[in-house]
Amino acid sequence: MKVNHSISRFRPASWFEKTKIIPPQVYIFRNLEYGQVLYSQFPNFSQTQVDKLFVRPNWSNRKPSLRRDIWKCMCVVNLQNYKQSVHLYQNLCRLRYLRDVAQRKESDKLRKKDSNGHVWYSGQYRPTYCQEAVADLRESLLKVFENATPAEKQTVPAKKPSIYWEDPWRMGDKDKHWNYDVFNALGLEHKLIQRVGNIAREESVILKELAKLESHPTEQTEVSSQ
């Protein structure tokens, strides 16, 4: 994956409002080699972002490389405004810090282990990191919507929030894990990313199409609802 220094810095909502470079989205990527998850404000990421998210790598959670062929978009979260998208990104990063640093021991106790006491893995892949990321996404979204100001809650939104998933299995049981009053009131939609193949070259095109879809919701695209 090509290093892009222009996306290495954290960008506030005011910057997105000014540039309109992408719609209010948060991108979540998973590593096909080790199973780790990376959060980004853009449909790409740099070494700086990897370094910030993986501050204490170890044998069970190695710092992943930027090789383009080992990263896949797990989901894209579409919010109603840039303030929400920035808050969601910040919440996800804070929860990652709690899991890996501030509350590392408590978090590690909840992870499935093998007979040697290591985080369970198959080959080198550890599925627990993706599962934790989905749980953190749900909790972060709840905080974003529940902490909205009274004025924001009374304002009729221009569009519904939505999540485009890599596959239905990745989001888990929709009725069990995503059935919350705040989600239902906002009409949170779960959709699937339509793929022809499974290659990194195609993925960049898909992410561009999702951005175009959210910028121009009336246009026809090849994204299917679940």
Curated annotation (Swiss-Prot):
Predominant localisation class: nucleus
Subcellular location: Nucleus; Mitochondrion
Molecular function, one GO term: structural constituent of ribosome
Entry GO CC: mitochondrial inner membrane; mitochondrial large ribosomal subunit; mitochondrion; nucleus
Keywords, sorted A to Z: Mitochondrion, Nucleus, Ribonucleoprotein, Ribosomal protein, Transcription, Transcription regulation
GO biological process, one term: positive regulation of mitochondrial DNA replication
Subunit architecture: Component of the mitochondrial large ribosomal subunit (mt-LSU). Mature yeast 74S mitochondrial ribosomes consist of a small (37S) and a large (54S) subunit. The 37S small subunit contains a 15S ribosomal RNA (15S mt-rRNA) and 34 different proteins. The 54S large subunit contains a 21S rRNA (21S mt-rRNA) and 46 different proteins.
Summary of the function given for this chain in its UniProt record: Component of the mitochondrial ribosome (mitoribosome), a dedicated translation machinery responsible for the synthesis of mitochondrial genome-encoded proteins, including at least some of the essential transmembrane subunits of the mitochondrial respiratory chain. The mitoribosomes are attached to the mitochondrial inner membrane and translation products are cotranslationally integrated into the membrane. mL67/MHR1 also has extraribosomal functions, being involved in regulation of mitochondrial DNA recombination, maintenance and repair, and generation of homoplasmic cells.
Extra facts: Present with 2610 molecules/cell in log phase SD medium.
Entry-linked PANTHER family: LARGE RIBOSOMAL SUBUNIT PROTEIN ML67 (PTHR28184:SF1), MITOCHONDRIAL HOMOLOGOUS RECOMBINATION PROTEIN 1 (PTHR28184)
Name assigned to this protein: Large ribosomal subunit protein mL67
Higher taxonomy: Eukaryota, Fungi, Dikarya, Ascomycota, Saccharomycotina
